Amino acid sequence: MIANETIAAIATPPGIGGVCIIRISGAQAHAIAVNITHKKNLVPRQAILSHFYDLSGEQIDQGIVLYFPAPHSFTGEDVVELQGHGGIAVAHALLSATLDFGARLAHAGEFTQRAFLNDKLDLAQAEAVADLIHARSQDALRAANRSLQGVFSQKIDALADELLRLRVYVEASLDFSEDEIDFLGEGKIREKLVDSLQKTQQLLAQSQQGQLLNDGIHLVLAGKPNAGKSSLLNALLGEERAIVTPQAGTTRDIVREDWIIDGIPVHLSDTAGLRESQDLVEQEGIRRSFDAVKRADIVLLLADGSARDNDARAEFVSLQEELHQLAPHAQFLVVYNKADLVDEQTAGDGLWISAKTGAGIEILLKKIATLAGKNQHEETVFIARKRHIHALESVEAHLQRALQQLEQFFVAELVAEELRLAHLALGTITGTVSSDDLLDEIFSGFCIGK
C-alpha cells in the first residue's frame, strides 16, 4: 500500500440494483470528484445531486455525490462517494472515470487498512468490520457490532494497562533491592497477578464464545446404514435435503449444509452409512465419512433404536469405540432414532428421537447448543478470531509462569520478563504490536470496496 496514492473501488455488490456506490479516498479525492461532477465546490457532508461525466466529457449518469474531508472520514483521508443508478455498466463506467482522473484501484480491505493506519480504529475493530459483513446470525451481528464499537478493545486495553503497571511495580523491586524494601514479599504483586490471570481467563472464555459465533462448529451425523441419518438431516433443516429410502446405503457421498442453531453457525454433514462394503462407490463414500468424523467438533452417532438384537447392539458399541479412537478431540452424542417404533426406551446416556414424527428434536437441538459451548450471556459476547484466542492463551501462559516464578523461585527479573511477554501478546490483538505481514494477511480477506 502506498499511502499518498488516491484509491477507488466499487463499494456495492456486482449486478443489477437500485444504487451503485463508488468510494474514493486520498488527497486527490476532491479533485477527482470535481472533474467527474463538473462542480467547483463540494459542500462537506452534504448530499448533492449531480451529473457524472467521463474523461471525454460524456455524461455517464446522474446521482448523488458526498464529500467527507480529512480527518473526519472513515479512512481519516479525504473521502468521496459517488452514488449512481445500480447496474454493471454504470458502476464500471464511474469506476473507470475515477481511474482516468488519477485514482488507482484499491486493494482488498485497503479502505479499512487506511482507517487503521490513521488511528480511526484499532486492529480488532478493523477485523470486526469484515465480521459484521459476514455475520450469519443475529447473535453474530450483535457480537460484531460490540467489537466494532470497541467493547473487546477496551477490555484488552484495560488488561494491558494493568499488566504494564504490575511490570513497573515488579521492576521497582529490582531498583530498590539494596534498600531492603521487599516488594515481592508483601503480597501485593501476587494478588495483582492472580487478579490479572483471572481477568485473562474470563476474557478468553468470552472470546471463545465470539469465535464460536464467527466460525461455527462442524457437526457430523454418523452411524450404520438405515439408522436414519438422512431423515434426521431433513428434520433438522425442515426440508427434504437428502434422499431417504428404505434401501441401506442410499447416501453415497457427504451431504453438507450450513445451518444456524441458537445463533451458532453449524456446518452440518450427513455421511454414508458405516459398514463393510464391496461396492467401490460406497467404499469411497465410507472413506469420506471417516474423514468427516476426524474433522468434526461434534458427532451425532445415530443408532436404529428399533434394532434390539444383541448383534446389532454389539456392532454399534464396536463402531462407537472405533469413532472415539478416530476423533478423540470430538464430542460425541449417542442418538437413538425411530422412537415411534419402540414401546420401551432405555438408552443409558443417549437421547431418543423420531426423525419421522419430530419427537425429541427440540431436546436434541438444546443438547447440541450446550455441547457447542453456548453458555455466555449474550450481552457479554463480542466477536473474536482464532488469532485473538491464540494471543490470549499466550497471555494466560505467561501470567501462569510469572506466578510460578514468584511463588517458587522469587526471581523478580523472570516475573518482569513474563509480564513483558504477556503485554506484547495483548498488543497483537489491537495492533499496538503488529507486523506488515500480519496486516497484509488480515486486510487481504476484506472486500475490495472496504
Curated annotation (Swiss-Prot):
<comment type="subunit">
    <text>Homodimer. Heterotetramer of two MnmE and two MnmG subunits.</text>
</comment>
<protein>
    <recommendedName>
        <fullName>tRNA modification GTPase MnmE</fullName>
        <ecNumber>3.6.-.-</ecNumber>
    </recommendedName>
</protein>
<feature type="binding site">
    <location>
        <position position="450"/>
    </location>
    <ligand>
        <name>(6S)-5-formyl-5,6,7,8-tetrahydrofolate</name>
    </ligand>
</feature>
<keyword id="KW-0630">Potassium</keyword>
<comment type="similarity">
    <text>Belongs to the TRAFAC class TrmE-Era-EngA-EngB-Septin-like GTPase superfamily. TrmE GTPase family.</text>
</comment>
<keyword id="KW-0963">Cytoplasm</keyword>
<comment type="function">
    <text>Exhibits a very high intrinsic GTPase hydrolysis rate. Involved in the addition of a carboxymethylaminomethyl (cmnm) group at the wobble position (U34) of certain tRNAs, forming tRNA-cmnm(5)s(2)U34.</text>
</comment>
<keyword id="KW-0342">GTP-binding</keyword>
<dbReference type="Pfam" id="PF12631">
    <property type="entry name" value="MnmE_helical"/>
</dbReference>
<feature type="binding site">
    <location>
        <begin position="226"/>
        <end position="231"/>
    </location>
    <ligand>
        <name>GTP</name>
    </ligand>
</feature>
<dbReference type="GO" id="GO:0003924">
    <property type="term" value="F:GTPase activity"/>
</dbReference>
<dbReference type="InterPro" id="IPR004520">
    <property type="entry name" value="GTPase_MnmE"/>
</dbReference>
<dbReference type="InterPro" id="IPR006073">
    <property type="entry name" value="GTP-bd"/>
</dbReference>
<dbReference type="Pfam" id="PF10396">
    <property type="entry name" value="TrmE_N"/>
</dbReference>
<feature type="binding site">
    <location>
        <position position="81"/>
    </location>
    <ligand>
        <name>(6S)-5-formyl-5,6,7,8-tetrahydrofolate</name>
    </ligand>
</feature>
<keyword id="KW-0479">Metal-binding</keyword>
<feature type="binding site">
    <location>
        <position position="23"/>
    </location>
    <ligand>
        <name>(6S)-5-formyl-5,6,7,8-tetrahydrofolate</name>
    </ligand>
</feature>
<keyword id="KW-0547">Nucleotide-binding</keyword>
<feature type="binding site">
    <location>
        <position position="251"/>
    </location>
    <ligand>
        <name>Mg(2+)</name>
    </ligand>
</feature>
<feature type="binding site">
    <location>
        <position position="230"/>
    </location>
    <ligand>
        <name>Mg(2+)</name>
    </ligand>
</feature>
<dbReference type="GO" id="GO:0005525">
    <property type="term" value="F:GTP binding"/>
</dbReference>
<keyword id="KW-0819">tRNA processing</keyword>
<dbReference type="InterPro" id="IPR018948">
    <property type="entry name" value="GTP-bd_TrmE_N"/>
</dbReference>
<dbReference type="Pfam" id="PF01926">
    <property type="entry name" value="MMR_HSR1"/>
</dbReference>
<dbReference type="InterPro" id="IPR027368">
    <property type="entry name" value="MnmE_dom2"/>
</dbReference>
<dbReference type="InterPro" id="IPR025867">
    <property type="entry name" value="MnmE_helical"/>
</dbReference>
<feature type="binding site">
    <location>
        <begin position="245"/>
        <end position="251"/>
    </location>
    <ligand>
        <name>GTP</name>
    </ligand>
</feature>
<feature type="binding site">
    <location>
        <begin position="270"/>
        <end position="273"/>
    </location>
    <ligand>
        <name>GTP</name>
    </ligand>
</feature>
<dbReference type="GO" id="GO:0002098">
    <property type="term" value="P:tRNA wobble uridine modification"/>
</dbReference>
<dbReference type="GO" id="GO:0030488">
    <property type="term" value="P:tRNA methylation"/>
</dbReference>
<dbReference type="InterPro" id="IPR027417">
    <property type="entry name" value="P-loop_NTPase"/>
</dbReference>
<dbReference type="GO" id="GO:0005829">
    <property type="term" value="C:cytosol"/>
</dbReference>
<keyword id="KW-0378">Hydrolase</keyword>
<feature type="domain" description="TrmE-type G">
    <location>
        <begin position="216"/>
        <end position="373"/>
    </location>
</feature>
<dbReference type="InterPro" id="IPR027266">
    <property type="entry name" value="TrmE/GcvT_dom1"/>
</dbReference>
<keyword id="KW-0460">Magnesium</keyword>
<feature type="binding site">
    <location>
        <begin position="337"/>
        <end position="340"/>
    </location>
    <ligand>
        <name>GTP</name>
    </ligand>
</feature>
<feature type="binding site">
    <location>
        <position position="120"/>
    </location>
    <ligand>
        <name>(6S)-5-formyl-5,6,7,8-tetrahydrofolate</name>
    </ligand>
</feature>
<dbReference type="InterPro" id="IPR031168">
    <property type="entry name" value="G_TrmE"/>
</dbReference>
<dbReference type="GO" id="GO:0046872">
    <property type="term" value="F:metal ion binding"/>
</dbReference>
<dbReference type="InterPro" id="IPR005225">
    <property type="entry name" value="Small_GTP-bd"/>
</dbReference>
